[in-house]
């Protein structure tokens, strides 16, 4: 059913979308299955195919984040970092992660990013991949050789084209799992070595930094690296994690998101948010978790001007994943968070431009996107309040045919198609249910 609305007076609770005011280009959305790729690979059929279809096709992701695999070079291939001793590398390891990446490719995922959690143990001060430890300065050339071999080898042996490489995941953080700490100055010096190696080997993977655990520390790393022209020339993307923002208070991070956006403008780099998720249990698997998650996505896109957003835990054995998979491999559960993030991931295509969208009501979060190739408009509205809100959407400088399909996620709806609506005189009037996420799109799905 198509609804027609004629609106003559603009009320206080209006939304305005202006196609003439443009911001960042969207590279895409995605996530990671890091550490638990075996869960999906070992899931019994037909469940395995069902989950792979949900994650790599239905959800709409185009970016899959991998862990750069150390075991391809568990011991030094030789003492010459300027020469690949290919016979000493082992590309038969990492089969779970490789299987996941290939299944993603089969379903249309086109972009692969790999982040380094730790270099091989023999390169580090503590001779372990876990805990703390740092990359020994005399091993910078060996690191560059290893990560280059990883990129070249995964393309040759597995057909996985790693287009983005995170030099170090959370260089500011230590844990009992794989980590490696770097000062901003150490990261700067390593980038110079890796960048030169990539040039010599013809590697076109984009270098991503600093992937700190939070935004605040990212600023210092960026300042140090970008103040050195010999390092700055190799940096392609700024990346952050959001763990310094309280999960249940997304707006507390707005000022820091604005700060990182200003750094991106200053240095002319796109921003990717490459990891964030709710890591506790009280809200895990609940609709509350889903509603907080999309508020973080909204803020990162609108205030951080991020070009990509990657969730942590696409799938997990816990309910904190978009899909939880049993360790026994005999069942799975799609959580509300899956449908909530789908409201962004499914409908905002790579290459789209974020355009201006303003809401007077603080309970209505709105963002809008223009696909210049097809002239399609996507509008995502989050009503985070406890009451339904009826409002007008005023469309300015929009040239596409104003017929929108509506999809909604709420406590009882799961990215459900709820009908078409046509703007009359470039104005819509819609009711957004309490605690809901609605996507309006002119694209034919």
Language model features by range: what are they?
Residues 31, 112, 165, 238, ...:
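Conserved, mostly hydrophobic/aromatic
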Residues 13-21, 50-51, 96-99, 149-150, ...:
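Alpha-helical scaffolding within the catalytic cores
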Residues 271-343, 354-359:
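Aromatic/acidic polysaccharide-binding cleft in carbohydrate-active enzymes
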Residues 142-146, 156-158, 164, 171-279:
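Active-site neighborhood of glycoside hydrolase catalytic domains
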Residues 396-414:
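Solvent-exposed beta-hairpin/edge-strand motifs
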Residues 15-163, 167, 182-188, 192, ...:
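N-terminal catalytic cores of secreted or lumenal carbohydrate-active enzymes
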Residues 360-402, 435:
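Carbohydrate-binding surface patches
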Residues 419-445:
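C-terminal beta-strand-rich structural cap/linker in extracellular carbohydrate-active enzymes
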């Amino acid at each position: 059913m198509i609804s027609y609305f004629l609106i003559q007076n603009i009320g206080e609770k209006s939304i305005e979308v202006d196609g003439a005011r443009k911001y960042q280009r969207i590279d895409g959305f995605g996530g990671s299955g890091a550490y638990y790729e075996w869960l999906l690979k070992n899931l019994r059929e037909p469940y395995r195919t069902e989950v792979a279809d949900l994650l790599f096709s239905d959800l709409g992701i185009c970016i899959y984040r991998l862990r750069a695999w150390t075991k391809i070079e568990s011991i030094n291939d030789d003492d010459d970092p300027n020469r690949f001793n290919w016979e000493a590398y082992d590309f038969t390891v990492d089969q779970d992660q490789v299987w996941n990446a290939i299944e993603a490719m089969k379903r249309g995922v086109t972009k692969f990013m790999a982040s380094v959690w730790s270099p091989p143990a023999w390169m580090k001060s503590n001779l372990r991949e876990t805990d703390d430890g740092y990359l020994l300065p005399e091993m910078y050339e060996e690191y560059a050789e290893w990560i280059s071999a990883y990129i070249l080898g995964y393309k040759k042996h597995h057909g996985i084209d790693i287009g983005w490489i995170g030099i170090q995941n959370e260089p500011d953080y230590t844990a009992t799992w794989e980590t490696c700490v770097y000062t901003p100055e150490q990261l700067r010096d390593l980038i110079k070595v890796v960048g030169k190696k990539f040039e010599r080997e013809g590697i076109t993977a984009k270098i991503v930094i600093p992937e700190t655990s939070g935004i605040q520390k990212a600023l210092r790393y960026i300042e140090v690296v970008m103040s050195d022209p010999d390092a700055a020339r190799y940096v392609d993307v700024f990346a952050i994690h959001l763990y310094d923002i309280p999960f249940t208070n997304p707006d507390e991070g707005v000022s820091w998101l604005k700060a990182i956006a200003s750094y991106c403008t200053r240095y002319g780099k796109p921003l990717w948010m490459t990891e964030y998720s709710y890591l506790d249990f009280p809200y895990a698997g609940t609709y509350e978790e889903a509603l907080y998650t999309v508020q973080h996505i909204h803020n990162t896109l609108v205030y951080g001007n991020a070009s990509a957003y990657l969730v942590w835990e696409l799938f997990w054995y816990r309910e904190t994943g978009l899909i939880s998979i049993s360790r026994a491999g005999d069942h799975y559960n799609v959580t509300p968070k899956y449908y909530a993030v789908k409201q962004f991931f499914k409908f905002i295509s790579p290459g789209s431009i974020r355009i201006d969208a303003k809401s007077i009501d603080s309970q209505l979060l709105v963002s809008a996107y223009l696909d210049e190739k097809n002239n399609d408009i996507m509008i995502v509205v989050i009503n985070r309040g406890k009451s339904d809100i009826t409002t007008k959407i005023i469309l300015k400088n929009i040239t596409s045919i104003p017929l929108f399909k509506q999809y909604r996620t709420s406590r009882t709806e799961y990215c459900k198609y709820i009908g078409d609506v046509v703007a009359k005189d470039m104005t819509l009037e819609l009711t957004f249910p309490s605690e809901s996420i609605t996507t309006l799109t002119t694209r034919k799905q």
